[in-house]
Amino acid sequence: MTDSPRRRFLMMAGGTGGHVFPALATARALQQRGHEVHWLGASGGMEERLIGDTDIPLSLIHISGLRGKGKLALLLAPFRLMRALGEAYTHLRRIRPDCVVGMGGFVTGPGGIAAWLMRKPLVIHEQNAIAGMTNRWLTRFSETVLEAFPGSFGDQTVTRCTGNPVRGEVASMDEPEQRLAGRSGKLRVLVVGGSLGAQVFNQQLPQALALMPEADRPDVRHQCGEKNLEAAQAAYEEAGVNASVEPFIRDMAEAYGWADLVICRAGALTVSELCAAGIGAILVPFPHAVDDHQTRNGQHMVKAGAAILVPQPRLTPEVLAETLKDLATDRKRILTMAKAARSLARPDATERVVNYCLEAANG
């Protein structure tokens, strides 16, 4: 499908897969409709590698977070922000987009202000159940404010609830009844710590599996994060447990299709992909997430019966082993959780975000 006239969009997203992948899904959908897409990211961020490997032109600015960086970083922050704003403004003048789309990460702050200074329509999208500080601040400069979960900005901001764009190959997966039909034997458990890994899973899951009788242990595929590969492999070896340990999984649709159950954080992208794929989960929210937004994200699935939520302070090898043991012998519950997850899916999320972007670009 091609929309007319052809428009030029600048995507802004970076820092984590939770920002990059929804933005990439949106970018691909815009390209499929015949539009031109550019990307603004932060130098040194994961977007530099992920988008650098695509056909999308990538521009970078120098920007990073301020939390926990000390007094010197706070003193230098205004100067660094001004430099980042200048870099963003220069890129926007060169690219001349018809619409700027902010999907999260530090880059969206200076990029959003640069768009406002150049009178370019700004669309922002909040992936989490509680809006982040940068997006809250940018609402006053935005043409359109989109959110994945209702009420993430509170009652004072006019928003459009779209759901989270997910990768097309995940959104098009078979229904749980088809995917899980006829499965028997050991439970297949996919462990995902997010694009950066989760040390608590790397440490505790091998110990939990060691507590289970070998006949009851699930088959495990574990994404541990690139920096944690050797430590995670050593933890499994020390526990005397076999598992397939990978630093990063690029084909998540294939991984979800293999799994009966997922153990993971409750990041916005993860929750949205679990729902799109139709797969139940044991959720362990990141305890230091700003405003505890991961717990709010996870409650979306828990209330529907699609997930079990375990706060990290309560997560022990014993608790994890007992939970897995209960699920390993109850495939009926596994299917029920998967169907509940699929009922929460927003398969039209990408299309809705794209349509709002086109509306802004066309004025």
UniProtKB/Swiss-Prot annotation:
GO-annotated molecular function: UDP-N-acetyl-D-glucosamine:N-acetylmuramoyl-L-alanyl-D-glutamyl-meso-2,6-diaminopimelyl-D-alanyl-D-alanine-diphosphoundecaprenol 4-beta-N-acetylglucosaminlytransferase activity; undecaprenyldiphospho-muramoylpentapeptide beta-N-acetylglucosaminyltransferase activity
Presence of keyword Iron: no
Kindly provide the name given to this protein in its UniProt entry.
Answer: UDP-N-acetylglucosamine--N-acetylmuramyl-(pentapeptide) pyrophosphoryl-undecaprenol N-acetylglucosamine transferase
CC annotations in GO: plasma membrane
Q: What is its EC number?
A: 2.4.1.227
Q: Which UniProt keywords apply?
A: Cell cycle, Cell division, Cell inner membrane, Cell membrane, Cell shape, Cell wall biogenesis/degradation, Glycosyltransferase, Membrane, Peptidoglycan synthesis, Transferase
Question: What family does the entry list?
Answer: Belongs to the glycosyltransferase 28 family. MurG subfamily.
Cystine pairings recorded for this chain: none
Species of origin: Marinobacter nauticus (strain ATCC 700491 / DSM 11845 / VT8)
Q: Which residues bind UDP-N-acetyl-alpha-D-glucosamine?
A: 16-18, 128, 167, 195, 249, 268-273, 294
Per its record, the protein catalyses:
di-trans,octa-cis-undecaprenyl diphospho-N-acetyl-alpha-D-muramoyl-L-alanyl-D-glutamyl-meso-2,6-diaminopimeloyl-D-alanyl-D-alanine + UDP-N-acetyl-alpha-D-glucosamine = di-trans,octa-cis-undecaprenyl diphospho-[N-acetyl-alpha-D-glucosaminyl-(1->4)]-N-acetyl-alpha-D-muramoyl-L-alanyl-D-glutamyl-meso-2,6-diaminopimeloyl-D-alanyl-D-alanine + UDP + H(+)
Source species, domain of life: Bacteria
Its membrane topology, per UniProt? Peripheral membrane protein
SUPFAM superfamilies assigned = UDP-Glycosyltransferase/glycogen phosphorylase
Q: Where in the cell is it found?
A: Cell inner membrane
